[in-house]
Amino acid sequence: ASIADVGSTTATLALDAAPVGALPKRLIAEQIAHFLPADTLAVAIDLPASPARDAVTAALRATGFAVESATGATRLVEAADEPGAIALRADDGTLLAASLGRADDPGFGDRLAEALRKVARVQQLLALRTSGSADNRADPFPVAACIAADGHRPTACPPLQAGGVRRIGMRERITATVINRGTRPVYVYVLAIDPFNAVDLVLPKPGEFDQPLPPNQPYRRAGMSFDAPGAYRFVVLASARPIRADAFQQAGGERDIAACRSPLERLLCASSEGRRDAGVVAVGEWSAQVSTVLATPEGAP
């Protein structure tokens, strides 16, 4: 079944196909397609017991949205090139902030909160997924997305490499292609998240206004390249309604959050602040998928 309508506390489902036999009087549906993040951001503090660690713990608590956890995927560590300073790195070793300064600096708390808000923002964006796969037949807004090296036809996305991932060299030019596989026009947007949690709008192209994409029509942006090696996540959004540009502005930009009115716009606006709008049910006239591309250094396999 697919979601046909969403109310304040209920959702109406429509069967995707005629039932084989008689249905019981009462059915229970379990939502399994949305990936809501935790209310707080788990951060590990890899520092020895000291006044500096105590100051880091206090600053982390003061953010209001991050909590200390030994299993956190984001870690606070000693800076490699600045004695006494604190750095922020991801669990995979990616350095997210080479130095946040010393823990006793007056501005340390603000720098820490800003760096962690970027991490939380990305978690919220990734949690917009409505499908765990790009070929989900039950998706109300099916969109085929392909992020690959330049040179392929719009309808012929190259196969993934070993391990089910795509690897693209740093010097290669890349193309992002989306195709509306549904039966009605939809607005399609593509966001790119780099290894350092910076977020950029890939589609619509710079300077273009968003237009509904007709069924079976590709929309492409070519000639792009990666800035650094590592994992890039691409969030592909398909919506029955256009999304205000304000909703894509990241924290620190000028925008009117109150103008974000549709459920998807409200979720995007909240995610830009590193939080989730609890008043929005994460279902509606939109869908989202996430794909990952590994940008490899020159000479890497």
Task: Please describe what each predicted stretch is.
Residues 1-39, 199:
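Beta-strand/loop-dominated core regions that host nucleotide or nucleotide-derived cofactor-binding catalytic loops
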Residues 28, 36-301:
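Secretory-pathway glycoprotein ectodomains that are cysteine- and/or Ser/Thr/Pro-rich
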